[in-house]
Design a protein with these regions (language model features):
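A conserved mid-protein helix/loop that constitutes part of the nucleotide-sugar donor-binding site
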Residues: 15-20, 197, 201-222, 241
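Short hydrophobic beta-strand element within catalytic cores of glycosyltransferases
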Residues: 297-301
Length: 365
């Protein structure tokens, strides 16, 4: 039995990858179960979903403790099993719940850059020390570490596991044909399909995504030419207010829209004139694969996970320093110009689901 664990089936990149992985492994004839701490969310047809708790707790620490106890009982009931903790936020629960269970093989999928190593990135101070300690703990405990990007192999805490042959690199993949089918829809926003051109960014309104630098870059671009910027993504009121206040101070508030989250990003990507991923750090960004699938001109930060590899070292999209607003503005200007824009072309064909499935099946068998 393969148990795929995440805390909840929320609208995140990790959860999208869990659904893909569950479906692919089940299609290969492997017994798979989705286990979450919290109920709800979109599951996978043909794959059982077991929620450990009846609902969320007012206290997140208490919720985590209850999830640990419930996951341990669930693992004990399953006997021999492979536990795949599919995202960084669930590793602590998976580690604590599985200690001392000899019939449980533990695989930790490192879904993001734990060390946040890009120059200028917010490191989190004491939080960085905690993340380092957790990385070392996972590396010692794991039967396998699965890294979603080759750059994560440079994490010092994983060096011992790599020497022991416990590290595998399995990047995310995408069904490009399905993405193109989903992109075939009406224009999703009043700004799209007309002038001035629209730049699209997608991601939680969080420090990791580096939207403050993007706004600074967009302000530089707006002094050179007309353009508009749409940022899709989940946010708290405070984050949204902060970005709107920055946009107002920069004089670009009328050309910025923050519509929140949407169920289907592909029509947005297909009708955008350029896509930008300014993140300080990532793992293997789904949204970059999604943009590549619909062949929109792309600007991405070099530190956004495996963006350098995905964009073939700049041959299929432009790469920039995430701290350099002027360079980001210049790259956006080039990608909005039909004479200089670089598109991904068929690069996405190198990152299909067959390669992802084959790699996981080899590891699990």
């Amino acid at each position: 039995m393969i148990i795929l664990y995440v805390h909840a089936l929320a609208a995140t990149g990790v959860v999208r990858n869990v659904r893909i992985l569950a479906a692919e492994l089940a299609a290969r004839g492997l017994a798979v179960e989705l286990v979450t701490a919290l109920p709800g969310g979109e599951g996978v047809t043909g794959v059982p979903h077991h929620a450990l708790l009846a609902g969320p707790y007012p206290s997140r620490p208490r919720e985590k403790l209850q999830a640990i106890a419930a996951l341990r009982r669930h693992l004990q009931s399953r006997g021999q099993a492979t536990l795949i903790s599919a995202g960084n936020h669930g590793h602590g629960t998976a580690w604590a719940a599985s200690q001392g269970l000899r019939d449980v093989r533990r695989i930790y999928r490192i879904s993001n850059d734990i060390m946040r190593s890009a120059v200028g990135a917010p490191s989190g101070g004491l939080g960085r020390l905690g993340r380092t300690a957790m990385a070392r703990l996972l590396a010692r405990d794991a039967d396998h570490l699965v890294l979603v990007s080759p750059i994560l192999a440079d994490t010092p805490a994983f060096a011992g596991a790599a020497r022991a042959g416990k590290v595998a690199v399995i990047p995310n993949g995408i069904d490009a044909d399905a993405a193109r089918f989903l992109a075939d829809g009406p224009v999703p926003h009043r700004w799209m399909g007309r002038t001035p051109p629209v730049i699209l960014a997608i991601g939680r309104l969080a420090l990791q995504k580096n939207f403050a630098t993007l706004l600074a870059a967009f302000a530089i671009l707006r002094r050179q030419r007309p353009a508009r910027l749409i940022i899709l993504g989940e946010s708290r009121d405070r984050a949204c207010y902060s970005l709107r206040a920055q946009a107002k101070a920069l004089g670009i508030a009328d050309d910025l829209d923050l519509p929140g989250t949407v169920d289907n990003v592909f029509p947005w990507l297909a009708h955008a004139d350029a896509f930008v991923l300014p993140s300080w750090w990532e793992g293997s960004p789904n949204v970059l694969l999604e943009a590549m699938a619909v062949d929109v001109p792309i600007v991405a930060s070099r530190s956004a996970g495996n963006a350098v590899d995905l964009l073939d070292h700049g041959r299929c999209g432009l790469l920039v320093d995430p701290a350099d607003a002027a360079a980001m503005a210049d790259a956006l200007a080039r990608q909005l110009d039909l004479a200089t824009a670089i598109r991904p072309g068929d690069r996405i064909d190198h990152f299909g689901l067959d390669a992802l499935s084959d790699a996981w099946v080899r590891l699990l068998r």
